[in-house]
Amino acid sequence: MDAQAYLLQLGQAAKSSGFALANLGVMAKNRLLGRVAAELKSAFDEILAANAKDVAAARASGLGDAMVDRLLLNDDRLKGIIADIDNVISLADPIGEEFDSRLLDNGMRLCRRRVPLGVIGVIYEARPNVTVEIAVLALKTGNAVILRGGKETLESNLALAAAIRRALAGEGLPEDCVQLIDNPDRALVTGLLKLDKFVDMIVPRGGQGLQRLCAEQATIPVILGGIGICHLYLDRDADISRAANVIINAKVQRPTVCNALDTLLIHRDKLDWLPTLARALQQQGVKLVACEQSLGALAAAGIEAEAASDESFGTEWLSLTLGVKVVADIDEAIAHIRHYSSGHSEAILTDNLAAATHFMNEVNSAAVYLNASTRFTDGGQFGFGAEVAVSTQKLHARGPMGLEALTTYKWLGVGDYSCR
């Protein structure tokens, strides 16, 4: 079967299977998700063994540590993925919600009802957890889903998808509500992007190359995001006794994810404190890429750092590397963010209410924080149970995408044999 015929088969199966989900009641959907969790537990060792094959192949091919960490599943990570399903089960089902009800002058009653989008296509790279997260959120909202993971995680994704499909069959539902493209041929990606007869929305979760490909090639609405060039501005009125923990958390906790800190902007009045912070960061293995002014302050304290270029500040590091730039004031910090930010997450540390208000008003990213780490931009942290992606665009969805982002609405009008 050629690529086009294969994709058409997937699309047709997803569309027809999705009708079985669309009006499924919340109890039935939650029972299904409970069965997904049970099937994943039953296949626990099988899934880890499949992931071990992916990790071994990745290391043998010379894949970097950051990418290997992204595709790695261990006991704790897999248990966490399964536990997150219970969180989604506990969430209110948005499907069927009626809102914006109104009675028109002609006697017709109108309202909007929340309904599934239909079929969602998700293209992602080296994160096997996405296979489960996306499938669970799609099923909870009555959507069918076509998944295309990276070739680096093919064995893991096959094992995870098989468990999910067993759960669907066990509940008497079509297995094709969740389908995984098991062929690494990149032509299937561009083909999926043009499957507008069957697929209602595409969500790419990957780097700039994937985002650009989807934006340029898709004939289906695309939710762009997941690229995080995240900033934290240390204001002149920040409490430095508490600031270090936030900065270290933002950079170090999990440096390979999109909400990790990429650039620290430090007010020039706090420059004397930079060497203290730098030592604490370097103890955690962080490499500093610093502007000329901060480089001088670090060198005077005997601390090594690499000189930053303009390109450095436009880089999503996805590693234990941190850009550092000294700014004259809050407005220079805001201007820097406007120029370099991907629109993901930014933060300010300050005890000055006027500065905080100014920053929160002027910085227009998907998530803006006062005295908090950028690491909070996450569906689980926001109370969504899990997330489809973090959208950095402004239409349909913005920020972490939970259940509601996988829905649309239709207008319902009730008349009395009404004519216009």
UniProtKB/Swiss-Prot annotation:
Catalytic activity: L-glutamate 5-semialdehyde + phosphate + NADP(+) = L-glutamyl 5-phosphate + NADPH + H(+)
GO biological process, one term: L-proline biosynthetic process
Sorted UniProt keywords: Amino-acid biosynthesis, Cytoplasm, NADP, Oxidoreductase, Proline biosynthesis
GO terms assigned for molecular function: glutamate-5-semialdehyde dehydrogenase activity; NADP binding
InterPro entries for the chain: Ald_DH/histidinol_DH, Ald_DH_C, Ald_DH_N, Aldehyde_DH_dom, G-glutamylP_reductase_CS, Glu-5-SA_DH, GPR_dom
UniProt entry tagged with the keyword Transmembrane helix: no
Enzyme Commission number(s) from the entry: 1.2.1.41
The protein's annotated pathway: Amino-acid biosynthesis; L-proline biosynthesis; L-glutamate 5-semialdehyde from L-glutamate: step 2/2
Gene3D superfamilies hit by this protein: Aldehyde Dehydrogenase, Chain A, domain 1, Aldehyde Dehydrogenase, Chain A, domain 2
Superkingdom: Bacteria
Gene Ontology CC terms, in alphabetical order: cytoplasm
Class in the EC hierarchy, top level: oxidoreductase
SUPFAM superfamilies: ALDH-like
A family per Pfam: Aldedh
Annotated function: Catalyzes the NADPH-dependent reduction of L-glutamate 5-phosphate into L-glutamate 5-semialdehyde and phosphate. The product spontaneously undergoes cyclization to form 1-pyrroline-5-carboxylate.
Membership in a protein family: Belongs to the gamma-glutamyl phosphate reductase family.
Protein name: Gamma-glutamyl phosphate reductase
Naturally occurring in which organism (per UniProt): Shewanella amazonensis (strain ATCC BAA-1098 / SB2B)
